[in-house]
Amino acid sequence: MNKFITVKEAANKWNVSERSVRNYCVLGRVPDAVFENGCWLIPETAKKPTRLNEKENKNHLLERLREEKKHQISGGIYHKLQIDLTYNSNHIEGSELTHDQTRYIFETRTIGLESTNTSVKVDDVIETINHFSAIDRVIDFANYELSESFIKELHKILKTGTSDSRLSWFAVGEYKKRSNEVGGLATTSPQQVNDEMKKLISDYNQKDKHSFEEIVEFHVKFERIHPFQDGNGRVGRLIILKECLKNNIVPFVILDNKKMFYYRGLKNWNQERGWLLDTCLDGQDTVKAYLDYFGIVYHS
């Protein structure tokens, strides 16, 4: 019968941090390690995992995004993801800007109108520019542990300067003051949002590394809480981007023409996880095609 030691005991034995020990366990690098009552138990005879080859552990996408962002390189993956993620995420929420208009705003910081009779909503333009800034923030802080303050910061970036921000009861960068619904379903009440969000983040951060399915599951729980008055979908998808980059997982884009499958998956997660996971995996295939085109190595 196996004898087990605690994470702390393994950390002392291997001369590494407790976080590193938990990370080894999460990644399956400690054979026969057991997760019980929120804690990892390590076989007493387990040996310290060897260090991964730097090439295997390298986050090529995040590295490229940061390089292209820093030097404002156009026509690369940073350029591509900024436009496609922003266009599709905003369009899901009702933005009327076209893909070309979104691209034009990103490239020139001006709005191109196809004719003198064309009009656009000011909020659509502001939220598009703000979404570009929010993606930049995600890239900069991708490796940080997810926190309430960061989530609130994303909301503040997204909604600053919009007509919503001028409403006395609309809390930009803070949790909602009025009850709301999503898809006709009730969400967490304003009085309970603080506690629910703290629990959601605390539970999620029990692990250092997360799988694709765990990131999607977090998204479902976040959207059901619906912590902000508006902008929850976009903030939620920005969190997905951050966590995929942090965990060296190819991110995904929910295309506007797949939004009904996306909504169906969110609504029916408890009954059938496969619907949402398949939609997200389809969106991941879209991004993988981008990475193949730009010659960026990723873990399949």
Regions found by a protein language model. Give the residues of each.
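FIC/Doc superfamily catalytic core
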Residues: 1-14, 18-30, 35-38, 44-300
